[in-house]
Amino acid sequence: MYPAKPAASSSQPAAEMAQPVVGIPISSPGAVAVGPVVGKWSSGLCACSDDCGLCCLTCWCPCITFGRIAEIVDRGATSCGVAGTIYTLLACFTGCHWIYSCTYRSRMRAQLGLPEACCCDCCVHFCCEPCALSQQYRELKARGFDPDLGWDVNAQKAAAAAAMYPPPAEGMMIR
C-alpha cells in the first residue's frame, strides 16, 4: 500500500532528504501572511467596481480608507484615527495629502513584495488617489487582513490561527 522506503545506501544522507514544511498554511481560515510574499497585485488600479462599498467610502471619505491602510501597514504603531486626521489636515491645508499616502503605498509594496506600477507610487497617488487607496485596501484584504478591524484584531486572529495549526513534529512520516 505504501511505497518502500529508500535504501540506506542512497546517495543522499537522511538529513539532506526532503524535510517537512513548518509553518501556517496561507490558505487556512483566519491566517495572516507574516513575511513578504513576492507577486503581483491581486487587483488592478482601476478595479474599483470589484467593491462598490469601498469605492464609495474612498471617494467620499478617503481619510477613513487611508487610516485603515496606515494602521495595518504600520502594524498598529499609528492608529486609524491619527493617520486619517493627519491625512485630512494635509488635504485641507496643503492639498499634498497624496505625498503622505504614497509613502504608505511604497512601504506596503516593500512589505508584501509587490511590484511598482508603470509609474512611481507618488504619480499613482497624485493622478488617482481614490483608485490607489482602493487598490491598497483590496490587496490587504486579499492577503488575509481585514482593515476594518484594525491591527490588534488582525494580530489576534493570526496568533489564534498559529495556535490552532501547530507545525508538524519532527520525525513524522515523510512521503
Swiss-Prot record:
Expressed in roots, coleoptiles, leaves and stalks. It is a multi-pass membrane protein. One of its GO terms (cellular component) is membrane. InterPro entries: PLAC_motif_containing. It is found in: Membrane. The keyword 4Fe-4S does not apply. Keywords: Membrane, Transmembrane, Transmembrane helix. The chain crosses the membrane at residues 53-73, 80-100. The keyword Membrane applies. Belongs to the cornifelin family. This is Cell number regulator 9.
